[in-house]
């Protein structure tokens, strides 16, 4: 899963974040929305052909058009370095023809809101950079 990226450095996750953005944009353009799109539900591997992703917990999916805004909102639950999320969202926004600065600002705001609310009800067992 993507859990191992929680403490990684930018040079370790930069290409992974961009590849994940391509994967997310691709499934969204194919009208697939995983409602629990989080690091624990995304399996990945890298080989000579690049990065490969697979989703688990697939009983929580919607099928139908995924707007750019809905797709961006779907990226709010990533933890770990903010830079990972910034790279992911910037690349996703480019692929969906959105303004990258506005997309990053929107997702970071929603990310902070999500984790603040989550932290009121649950213990967060890792360092969270908001």
Model-predicted segments: where are they?
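Conserved structural core of kinase catalytic domains
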Residues: 1-15
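Activation segment
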Residues: 6, 36, 46, 62-64
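Conserved protein kinase catalytic/activation segment
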Residues: 41-55
């Amino acid at each position: 899963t993507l859990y191992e990226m929680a403490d990684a450095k930018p040079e370790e996750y930069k290409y992974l974040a961009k590849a994940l953005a391509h994967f997310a944009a691709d499934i969204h353009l194919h009208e697939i929305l995983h409602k629990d799109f989080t690091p624990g539900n995304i399996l990945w591997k890298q080989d000579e052909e690049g990065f490969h992703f697979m989703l688990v917990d697939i009983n929580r999916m919607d099928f139908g058009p995924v707007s750019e805004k809905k797709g961006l909102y779907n990226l709010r639950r990533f933890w770990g370095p903010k830079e990972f999320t910034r790279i992911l969202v910037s690349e996703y926004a480019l692929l969906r023809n959105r303004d990258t600065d506005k997309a990053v600002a929107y997702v970071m705001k929603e990310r902070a809101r999500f984790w603040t609310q989550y932290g009121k009800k649950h213990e967060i067992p890792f360092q969270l950079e908001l």
